[in-house]
Amino acid sequence: MNAKLIYLLLVVTTMMLTFDTTQAGDIKCSGTRQCWGPCKKQTTCTNSKCMNGKCKCYGCVG
C-alpha cells in the first residue's frame, strides 16, 4: 500500500517538474544572462538558465 502511494507521488512530482520548464525557442546562449530577456517575454519571469547552449525558462513561483 505504501509503495503504491510513494510511486504515485513520484510520478506526479516528476510530471509537475517536467511541465514547469519550457524551452525559449531555439535561442542559443553562452551564459545565463542572455536568457533573461527571452524568458521574460515568454513567462514574465527572468528565472532561466543556459544549458547545453540553449535557454531553459522556469515558471514563476507564487
UniProtKB/Swiss-Prot annotation:
One of its GO terms (cellular component) is extracellular region. The record marks K49 as: Pharmacophore, responsible of Kv1 potassium channel pore occlusion. Changing T43Q: 30-fold decrease in ability to inhibit Kv1.1/KCNA1, and no change in ability to inhibit both Kv1.2/KCNA2 and Kv1.3/KCNA3 potassium channels. Disulfide bonds join C29-C50, C35-C55, C39-C57, C45-C60. The modification Valine amide is found at V61. It is found in: Secreted. Residues 1-24 form the signal peptide. InterPro entries: Scorpion_toxin-like_sf, Scorpion_toxinS_K_inh. C-terminal amidation is important for activity. There is a 50-70-fold decrease in ability to inhibit Kv1.2/KCNA2 when the toxin is not amidated. This decrease may be explained by a 23-fold slower association rate (k(on)) together with a 2-fold faster dissociation rate (k(off)). It comes from the Eukaryota. GO terms for molecular function: ion channel inhibitor activity; potassium channel regulator activity; toxin activity. Its main location: secreted. Reversible blocker of voltage-gated potassium channels with fast binding and unbinding kinetics. Has highest activity on human voltage-gated potassium channel Kv1.2/KCNA2 channels (IC(50)=0.11-0.16 nM), whereas its affinity for other channels tested was in the nanomolar range (hKv1.1/KCNA1, IC(50)=253 nM; hKv1.3/KCNA3, IC(50)=91 nM; and hKCa3.1/KCNN4, IC(50)=70 nM). Negative results: has no effect on hKv1.4/KCNA4, hKv1.5/KCNA5, ether-a-go-go-related gene type 1 (hERG1), and ether-a-go-go-like (hELK2) channels. Belongs to the short scorpion toxin superfamily. Potassium channel inhibitor family. Alpha-KTx 06 subfamily. Has the structural arrangement of an alpha-helix connected to antiparallel beta-sheets by disulfide bonds (CS-alpha/beta). This is Potassium channel toxin alpha-KTx 6.21. It comes from Urodacus yaschenkoi (Inland robust scorpion).
